[in-house]
Amino acid sequence: TKVEIPVSNVTPGTVAVLVHPDGTEEIVKNSVPTENGIQLTVNGNATVKIVDNAKGFIDTQDHWAKDDIDFVSARGLVSGMSATIYAPNNSTTRAQLWTILARQNDADLTGGSVWYEKAQNWAKDKGVSDGTDPDTAINRAQMVTMLWRAAGQSAAAGSAANFTDVPADSYYAQAVAWAVENGITAGVGGGRFDPDAACTRAQIAAFLYRSMK
């Protein structure tokens, strides 16, 4: 059931926390700030509390993606490099993106012979990625494509033809069209999407937040 809990002074770092009968707590990743509070989907008679879980990274305070970063880090989707550093302009590997998307979809990532093994298997099972090249940095085309696949590959009504650098027969054309249609990206300006550019940690936060609104 989708509900909205009234909250004053809500910020992107404001999250809903599910309190289980045994007292354990779990952040509700799909709890999204609205104009008047927090919207989330809950099952049955859940006990929920609202907390400010913003991390306060010192290197994002004046960054264009501060709100996006506050949102994803408060929900445990993207971790900081440390308690105080997010490193918004750093690139992201394929293994890191598998992990982020697996977390978003509540996959169990405990165990595995390497830290990304469970996320890698999840990505392959769900058709999000072929699971190769875990240490390779992702570009913008790969980011949007994996996000689209993780969201169920819904067809876009339009096309990505408004971008001069997205060929209609490219593997990522449908994903870019979907992302534009859903307000996830507007490109980089000048009629370009810049598919081959490295996708920074700030851009990943922005793509994720917009996809969850």
For the regions a protein language model found, what residue spans apply to each?
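Exposed aromatic-hydrophobic patches
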Residues: 2-7, 37-43
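Proteolytic processing hotspots in large secreted/extracellular or virion-associated proteins
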Residues: 1-15, 20-22
